């Protein structure tokens, strides 16, 4: 039997896979806490300088500085105000730079060495550098530790997402992918709750990092991805993992015998360069990189342009996470419909997000009706969140197993560039107040239209090797499944 037939025999989403994927999706709470750490740890307290006619030296500012807040942050401890205020944003930028590097290197590394060892190593060092963050004796140590947390967190989270997908049958990839992103949004709200009760920034960083130990210890029982084992020629090992899953799913005396996987062996060399070497992957990668870049640009740009919410800091952080929750049931509904699928859902959500940005230009700020700029901006954020969710799932299905993590890593790298660029788009307001929303709108609409050039993957077999994508038999089977699904 081939791998997809084996999953049907074993159970595509049995009790064993539910435990494995449930554990890895809960890991996203830890990932979210690390990703959002700077929001509360770097919060700027209200402060008063009792003598504004002092020199610009830091020592003089400290003597005349007073604050009346009931929380601490790196700003209050290291007095990152006035000419040193930029250091908070610098630490945040270093974290995102680390994410970019982690996405680039961890993807190909896990395609070569295996998902499990790369994931475990990344999580271990993520925890180590997380404690360096909490115990940092100076801003410089804090900033460097945030960079390395970004490297490990971004790479580890990427590999754990792929593991979550590859533990289950292909028909459940949409569900597990959506759950991963849903729990991340819930994790943001959980971090806000921690911050509400823990007002000391060092204690907060320590507590937010500590669940990683729990996840690391339990992660040692995770098996290697059977899809990766099969794609690399470790057929016997893949059979053993599948038989273990079958036993966990209640199959009595399971016996799995896989066909040898054509086109690859344990010594096959696959790298990120395969994404440009083969034409079928080259154009997919170019289109996907642009789509990921736009998703990130519009998502973070809308967050900045919607304006800062007034009121309780911790409630605001929670709302920024929970506003994404409705995107996930919408995503699950549309991507499984024959008239929508992955491709049209991606296009639709991106186009809706783009038009929401453009329509914001024509609605007066003083409009008291239901349709106002804030509502349109939030609708745009909801739409682009749904697009982000679909794109994660869609990208996993477009790449064969042997280069799946490499493909996801390159796309995630493009995504980080969008996130880095998005804070600079609001500066375009100095030329025209409408220009940022025009830029976001055009980007969203163009990415939505270009996504229609990608092939649909709904109800199509997963390619294990690059040769699978190029074989006439695979293409014929894909068309046959598409016809059957539409009848």
Curated annotation (Swiss-Prot):
Topology in the lipid bilayer = Multi-pass membrane protein
Looking up Pfam families in the UniProt record yields: Sugar_tr
Coiled coil location: none
Functionally, this protein is described as follows: Probably transports organic cations.
Q: Which GO terms describe its biological process?
A: monoatomic ion transport
The record, for SUPFAM superfamilies, names:
MFS general substrate transporter
Query: What PROSITE patterns does its record include?
Result: MFS (PS50850)
CDD domains recorded for this chain? MFS_SLC22A15 (cd17377)
Give the top-rank taxon of the lineage listed in the UniProt record for this protein.
Eukaryota
What is the protein's name according to its record? Answer: Solute carrier family 22 member 15-like
Where do glycans attach?
A: 70
A single GO molecular function term of this UniProt record: transmembrane transporter activity
| Keyword Ion transport appears in the UniProt entry | yes
Give TM regions. 23-43, 90-110, 117-137, 141-161, 178-198, 203-223, 286-306, 315-335, 345-365, 374-394, 408-428, 435-455
What are its GO cellular component terms? Answer: membrane
């Amino acid at each position: 039997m081939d791998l997809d037939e084996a999953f049907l025999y074993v159970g595509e989403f049995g009790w064993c896979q539910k435990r494995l994927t449930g554990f890895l999706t809960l890991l996203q709470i830890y990932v979210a806490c690390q990703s959002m750490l700077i929001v509360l740890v770097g919060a700027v307290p209200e402060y008063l300088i009792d003598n504004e006619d002092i020199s610009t030296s830091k020592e003089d500012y400290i003597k005349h500085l007073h604050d009346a807040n009931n929380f601490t942050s790196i700003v209050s401890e290291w007095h990152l105000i006035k000419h040193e205020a930029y250091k908070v944003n610098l630490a945040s930028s270093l974290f995102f730079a680390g994410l970019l590097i982690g996405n680039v290197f961890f993807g190909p590394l896990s395609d070569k060495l295996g998902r499990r060892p790369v994931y475990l190593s990344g999580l271990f060092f993520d925890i180590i550098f997380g404690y360096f963050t909490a115990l940092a004796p100076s801003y410089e140590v804090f900033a460097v530790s945030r960079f390395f947390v970004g490297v490990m967190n971004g790479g580890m989270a990427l590999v754990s997402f792929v593991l979550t997908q590859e533990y289950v049958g292909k028909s459940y990839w949409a569900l597990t992918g959506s759950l991963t992103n849903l729990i991340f949004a819930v994790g943001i709200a959980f971090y806000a709750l921690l911050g509400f009760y823990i007002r000391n920034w060092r204690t907060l960083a320590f507590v937010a990092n500590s669940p990683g130990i729990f996840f690391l210890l339990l992660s040692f029982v995770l098996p290697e991805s059977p899809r990766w084992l099969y794609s690399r020629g470790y057929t016997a090992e893949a059979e053993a993992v599948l038989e273990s899953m079958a036993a966990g799913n209640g199959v009595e005396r399971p016996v799995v015998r896989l066909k040898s996987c054509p086109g690859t062996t344990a010594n096959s060399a696959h790298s990120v360069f395969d994404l440009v070497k083969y034409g079928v992957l080259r154009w997919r990668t170019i289109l996907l990189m642009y789509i990921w870049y736009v998703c990130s640009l519009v998502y973070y740009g809308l967050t900045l342009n919607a304006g800062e919410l007034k009121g309780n800091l911790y409630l605001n952080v929670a709302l920024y996470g929970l506003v994404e929750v409705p995107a996930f049931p919408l995503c699950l509904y549309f991507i499984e419909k024959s008239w929508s699928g992955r491709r049209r859902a991606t296009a639709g959500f991106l186009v809706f997000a783009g038009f929401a940005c453009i329509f914001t230009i024509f609605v007066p700020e003083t409009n008291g009706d239901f349709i106002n700029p804030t509502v349109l901006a939030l609708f745009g954020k909801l739409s682009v969140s749904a697009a982000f969710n679909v794109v994660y799932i869609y990208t996993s299905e477009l790449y064969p197993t042997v280069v799946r993590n490499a493909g996801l890593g390159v796309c995630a790298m493009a995504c980080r560039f969008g996130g880095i660029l998005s804070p600079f788009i609001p500066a375009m307001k100095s030329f025209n107040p409408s220009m940022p929303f025009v830029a976001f709108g055009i980007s969203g609409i163009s990415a939505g239209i270009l996504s229609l050039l990608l092939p649909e993957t709904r109800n199509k077999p997963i390619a294990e090797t690059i040769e699978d994508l190029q074989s006439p038999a695979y293409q014929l089977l894909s068309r046959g499944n598409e016809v059957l699904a539409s009848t």
